[in-house]
Amino acid sequence: MIGKLTGTLLEKNPPEVLLDCHGVGYEVNVPMSSFYNLPAVGERISLLTQFIVREDAQLLYGFATAPERQAFRALIKITGVGPRMALSILSGMSVADLAQAIARQEAARLVKVPGVGKRTAERLLLELKGKLGADLGASHGPAVSGAQADILQALLALGYNDKEAAAALKALPAQVEVSDGIKWALKALTK
């Protein structure tokens, strides 16, 4: 899988960019939120990427930030939401706005995004509830820093929701290494 590309920006044709990485040109689809923040053609850039393989195409999607890529990955797991719609959602609202809309169960905000209907918005709210807050910086998530943030990410990646992960973090000692903290948190969650 291609996780990151760094190279010279050759072309900007919304929502696609052409990136030259050591003589190889990569066409990368980017959400408009990232597109507007790109430097001028000829400048060096780095994009975090998601590689999607379909029967008829191999596509690269690029993101300026890790939370943006995490949101994209979460969105494409939802039934009826493909990469194109996920890109549209991330182009229509910031990652923080998306996390906030999901945390507050605001379908009306999601319906404003082109291509997202009432049913899709309700499905997004249902399937992403409790999964995006800490990943994407929603204000309802637990405030953590340093090793605790890494432990929280690990717990969320293992499928625990925000509430469970936050409860496990409270059981940890103040100064703990990430690997030990994950073990402690998992023990706390299994009690």
UniProtKB/Swiss-Prot annotation:
Gene3D superfamilies: 5' to 3' exonuclease, C-terminal subdomain, DNA helicase RuvA subunit, C-terminal domain, Nucleic acid-binding proteins. One of its GO terms (molecular function) is four-way junction DNA binding. Its main location: cytoplasm. Residues 65-140 are annotated as: Domain II. One of its GO terms (biological process) is DNA repair. It is found in: Cytoplasm. It holds the Pfam family RuvA_C. Residues 143-191 are annotated as: Domain III. Residues 140-142 are annotated as: Flexible linker. Homotetramer. Forms an RuvA(8)-RuvB(12)-Holliday junction (HJ) complex. HJ DNA is sandwiched between 2 RuvA tetramers; dsDNA enters through RuvA and exits via RuvB. An RuvB hexamer assembles on each DNA strand where it exits the tetramer. Each RuvB hexamer is contacted by two RuvA subunits (via domain III) on 2 adjacent RuvB subunits; this complex drives branch migration. In the full resolvosome a probable DNA-RuvA(4)-RuvB(12)-RuvC(2) complex forms which resolves the HJ. HAMAP family: DNA_HJ_migration_RuvA. Belongs to the RuvA family. This is Holliday junction branch migration complex subunit RuvA. The gene is ruvA.
